[in-house]
């Protein structure tokens, strides 16, 4: 029964995404509207759609799984690096690319680079477009593959059928609504992701026996709560987390400066003077969300130790939020529906990869 309710919640969620595409299609009157939403995004939509499309499945699966296996150091230093990268990207790049792209009437990044550097022969256009296509193909494919694996493991769906359904949903709302549909659905996704993180962390703490029980379990593991050591689950020992590891982890934040789907949000905001508001919203949301996601991993390990959910190893640890949500669904129909919404959010984080690649 719980699986049927979960499936209903996921179908409802995906139906809402297609509906957003239909609504947004009525607001597109030219190419500029389709590719940049007519440069009419407000500061909240700009901030939250950028970060939801950026975080994708890493926030709900990668970070909790990392914390579950190794403790605070790896996940927390990553969170700090990503928060700093987010802030600096908004501070350094956002306003300039908004002003220049608008001044040159450029609606895509290759078009912007070509006009910005006087590329009359369109060599820069071809190179930048080729780089985006080449590197976004595996990025997009990973999103489709993740959707297939998620629905297969969660509901027993055929792997290939799940990928096809995911592709149909993406193509429908992207071709109908374009950039505005992608940005609006990402805004909704950011709200649902926030809801999912809050529900899972509160439910997990209660089921673990309280925050005291969670901390007691974590303290018993060597290096688990140490920012300069990491826990090694295989040997139940700790390892050094030194300077070079910290620097390399912090360097994750440098990736933001070249992410096309984030740069397009900068180009699409209605007023460059509102980017300061977007920067604050984005940075705060990213940092808090990553810290909560780290907490879910720590809480999840306690649930495993208590026998409430299975002990996870290796890449299985990335399904910790799925396991907790599935356990939530066993309580009653309302809990099952809430779990379905959470799992729909998880599934949609995989869809944001191909969505932003297409748009």
What are these model-derived regions, one by one?
Residues 2-25, 37, 67-107, 111, ...:
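Extracellular loop-to-transmembrane helix junctions
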Residues 66-72, 93-96, 146-154, 168-190, ...:
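Membrane-water interface regions at transmembrane-helix termini and the short interhelical loops
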Residues 50-54, 83, 186, 190, ...:
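Transmembrane helix-bundle signature of multi-pass membrane transporters/permeases
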Residues 14, 53, 83-86, 132, ...:
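Residue-level recognition of pore/gate-forming positions within transmembrane alpha-helices
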Residues 77-174, 249-255, 344-348:
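Helix-loop-helix module between adjacent transmembrane segments
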Residues 2, 36-41, 45, 62-79, ...:
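Loop-to-helix junctions at membrane interfaces in multi-pass transport proteins
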Residues 1-61, 174-177, 202, 209:
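Membrane-interface "cap" regions at the ends of multi-pass membrane proteins
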Residues 349-355:
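Conserved small/polar residues in nucleotide/adenosyl-binding loops
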